[in-house]
Amino acid sequence: MKPVHERSQECLPPKKRDLPVTSEDMGRTTSCSTNHTPSSDASEWSRGVVVAGQSQAGARVSLGGDGAEAITGLTVDQYGMLYKVAVPPATFSPTGLPSVVNMSPLPPTFNVASSLIQHPGIHYPPLHYAQLPSTSLQFIGSPYSLPYAVPPNFLPSPLLSPSANLATSHLPHFVPYASLLAEGATPPPQAPSPAHSFNKAPSATSPSGQLPHHSSTQPLDLAPGRMPIYYQMSRLPAGYTLHETPPAGASPVLTPQESQSALEAAAANGGQRPRERNLVRRESEALDSPNSKGEGQGLVPVVECVVDGQLFSGSQTPRVEVAAPAHRGTPDTDLEVQRVVGALASQDYRVVAAQRKEEPSPLNLSHHTPDHQGEGRGSARNPAELAEKSQARGFYPQSHQEPVKHRPLPKAMVVANGNLVPTGTDSGLLPVGSEILVASSLDVQARATFPDKEPTPPPITSSHLPSHFMKGAIIQLATGELKRVEDLQTQDFVRSAEVSGGLKIDSSTVVDIQESQWPGFVMLHFVVGEQQSKVSIEVPPEHPFFVYGQGWSSCSPGRTTQLFSLPCHRLQVGDVCISISLQSLNSNSVSQASCAPPSQLGPPRERPERTVLGSRELCDSEGKSQPAGEGSRVVEPSQPESGAQACWPAPSFQRYSMQGEEARAALLRPSFIPQEVKLSIEGRSNAGK
């Protein structure tokens, strides 16, 4: 009878049987459980590159050929401290397969021709041995073009054995990644075929057609006890943690004065840490280096990245791609922190002013520094586009919840933490047109002044249009009657003033219409009331006025119709507009008090008592007529605006001397809204409130 092991092998397929290994077979080919090379290629690749992946447990190797000692029956895992590294020369074909070498423990005489990077016609140098620690190393190069050139001594001496003969001339192509970048990355498994090796390589490399590679790379920074850190450029999804770096020398040329001005602006921001304040200094030093001569690719300021408590100097391209390590151990490695650090030294040196609580300013006017460049009188296509323009149109009282806007500031002035910080008298520090990011804060912009003179404050601005001027808006008169804004007539204003009590109708005659000093505004000169008080106001050309016997009119009827869908006539010199003022005011203050302050001009939707509140919504004394009477209220506008929290702008001469009198007069006025009207408007659910 046959032995037991012979009978068991007969039941196995031929490939599973343990065939005896003869010296002829060993001399002819070298075989491995996971890699096989034809015998015809063995002689050509007998001294080629050794590439082996993570072998499975219990994998057997059979060795032989070219003077190598035959070692059989040994597992690969038994050679845990020996690594064999061989790298192709500089003539490596760019169209070759990916040069990803995943080192695994190998015996000293293990010599196998690998099909992973096999390329006919290329000679590879002899193999060299290096005593390396048990941790696996991974060298990643580009499959599309020549990878980075490694500077001398790229491997720290503690990693190499003193007797190791590893010349750096044989390792010109591979860039080591730091251990912190390889913590979360697992080496790709060994593939039995070259086509399988493409699965992992593109995620860690970049095509040469997208971004140019460096001809030489120097370490960006060295951490104590770590290998040099190199950043590889990639536009593809990162399989390994990559930091994008620009082409060599793509940095701006800035004067020391500009860097100093940015430093002072950053130092004025009290919320910065000392490390963040050092960014500008480090940036200035890097820009003054010889490598700062650019290739015309825009501003690329140097940015510091905080990784695992170590400060690494990187570079930031116009397309910022900063990735955090795979396993973030500390908050400093978060992507949000790196973005904040990048924003502090961004291209235009924008200073982000901390958004503060609004404080009462002397005039309580939301002043915005105007856009001195201005723009043409072309009409916007819609109200949303109007808000995105350079604030030359649609200037209305500002909502407190507006997003941050970009606004140019006067020369040599920077807003930091809500305060104007002079950065010097040199006019070249901050050229006109350079954008400064300023938080939308009323008290900040109310104090914004030019260093040379004190001009007239700009009119109140807003990026939202008042909804009560929109066609179809329902207006409640002081008599309780509801009308659409486009259906209002002169008698509606007269009756509302009579019923309200304490009010009187005044006529405001237009005597002159001029262009304002502020872009996008017109200055209207009126003669108001019996005292013939001369009043001048600045309003947007699309602002509607109510003219006796004519209806709504504006300086730009077409634009008013486009923005509000409200039919308008053209306002001309000699037109008499409706204005309502308080009867209790003396003659010398009528022209100032008949218009309420911006805080009092909000629609009744904001008022808790929903009462009819007088001429604050009917008109202002400069000839601007409100769309309804004393109790005008927007009940259901056809085009609601989220930011329509106030009516039109108060004039530049507005003062608050009569604010208390108007408040007292409002408290004396009863509500003229019947209960039936309330139920019809608000619904039955609010009847008990």
Swiss-Prot record:
GO MF, one annotated term: RNA binding
Modified residues (Phosphoserine): S284, S361, S615
Major localisation: nucleus
Chain residue ranges for the region called Self-association: 20-197
Region described as Disordered: spans on this chain: 1-46, 185-223, 242-297, 357-405, 617-647
Signal peptide: none
Region entry Interaction with NCOR2 and ATXN1, spans: 20-197
A Pfam family hit: ATXN-1_C
Record-listed Phosphothreonine modification sites: T330
SMART domains: AXH (SM00536)
Biological processes per GO annotation: brain development; extracellular matrix organization; learning; lung alveolus development; memory; negative regulation of transcription by RNA polymerase II; positive regulation of hematopoietic stem cell proliferation; social behavior
Tissue: Expressed in cerebellum and cerebral cortex.
Domain AXH: 457-588
Annotated compartments: Nucleus; Cell projection, Dendrite
Keyword Transmembrane: no
Its job: Chromatin-binding factor that repress Notch signaling in the absence of Notch intracellular domain by acting as a CBF1 corepressor. Binds to the HEY promoter and might assist, along with NCOR2, RBPJ-mediated repression. Can suppress ATXN1 cytotoxicity in spinocerebellar ataxia type 1 (SCA1). In concert with CIC and ATXN1, involved in brain development.
Record PANTHER family: ATAXIN 1 (PTHR13392), ATAXIN-1-LIKE (PTHR13392:SF6)
Subunit structure and binding partners: Homodimer. Interacts with CIC. Interacts (via AXH domain) with NCOR2. Interacts with ATXN1. Directly interacts with RBPJ; this interaction is disrupted in the presence of Notch intracellular domain. Competes with ATXN1 for RBPJ-binding. Found in a complex with CIC and ATXN1.
Protein name: Ataxin-1-like
Gene: ATXN1L
